[in-house]
Swiss-Prot record:
This is ATP-dependent Clp protease proteolytic subunit 2. The gene is clpP2. SUPFAM superfamilies: ClpP/crotonase (SSF52096). GO terms for molecular function: ATP-dependent peptidase activity; ATPase binding; serine-type endopeptidase activity. InterPro entries: ClpP (IPR001907), ClpP/crotonase-like_dom_sf (IPR029045), ClpP/TepA (IPR023562), ClpP_Ser_AS (IPR018215). It comes from Synechococcus sp. (strain CC9605). It is found in: Cytoplasm. Keywords: Cytoplasm, Hydrolase, Protease, Serine protease.
């Protein structure tokens, strides 16, 4: 069930679902696994916010166990494509593709709340069928692993060898450890007060 927010104005009351209300503040929330549905929703919200004001930052809050690499790369590419800076904030858990998207925010604007957990690892996949089909799937997983590791290396400042070693198995970090690793830029406990224009 999605919570409803009631807003009063001189013209009466209006009801919004909580996500629509947050979107008015340029906040997008990824609070589930990365799927084609969640990715399409997030991409559409980012494109809408860019069209509305390409100069104002977007805030992506992430509490996700990860999910589809392809759908996550769609979000990632959109984050790089749009003009507004994207602040990323981990709330709870950013694991697998969730951690990748957390790290994909604008450099200097990637953060985590203090009790969150962040986990990176290699892409997961499985294959069945004929040997030739299994080889095709294995080659694709290896391609994705190399692509994700290269992006993580570029965005964290860690060597590719270090990223490959650390993503070989689940690698959990506290926010402070993730900051020292280069996945995020700050650990926050209170939202900064926004300047009034």
């Amino acid at each position: 069930m999605i919570p409803i927010v009631i807003e009063e104005s001189g013209r009466g009351e209006r009801a919004f679902d909580i996500y629509s209300r947050l979107l008015r503040e340029r906040i997008i929330f990824l609070g589930e696994a990365v799927t084609s549905d969640s990715a399409n929703r997030i991409v559409a919200q980012m494109l809408f916010l860019e069209a509305e004001d390409p100069e104002k930052d977007i805030y992506l809050y992430i509490n996700s166990p990860g999910g589809s690499v392809y759908d996550g790369l769609g979000i990632f590419d959109t984050m790089q494509h749009i003009k507004p800076d994207v602040h990323t904030v981990c709330v709870g858990l950013a694991a697998s593709m969730g951690a990748f998207l957390l790290c994909a925010g604008t450099k200097g604007k990637r953060s985590s709340l203090q009790h969150s957990r962040i986990m990176i690892h290699q892409p997961l996949g499985g294959a069945q069928g004929q040997a030739s089909d299994i080889r095709i799937q294995a080659d694709e997983i290896l391609f994705l692993k190399e692509r994700l590791n290269k992006e993580l290396s570029d965005r964290t400042g860690q060597t590719l060898d270090r990223i490959q070693q650390d993503t070989d198995r689940d690698f959990f970090m506290s926010p402070t450890e993730a900051m020292n690793y280069g996945l995020i830029d700050s650990v926050i406990d209170k939202r900064p007060v926004q300047a009034v224009a």
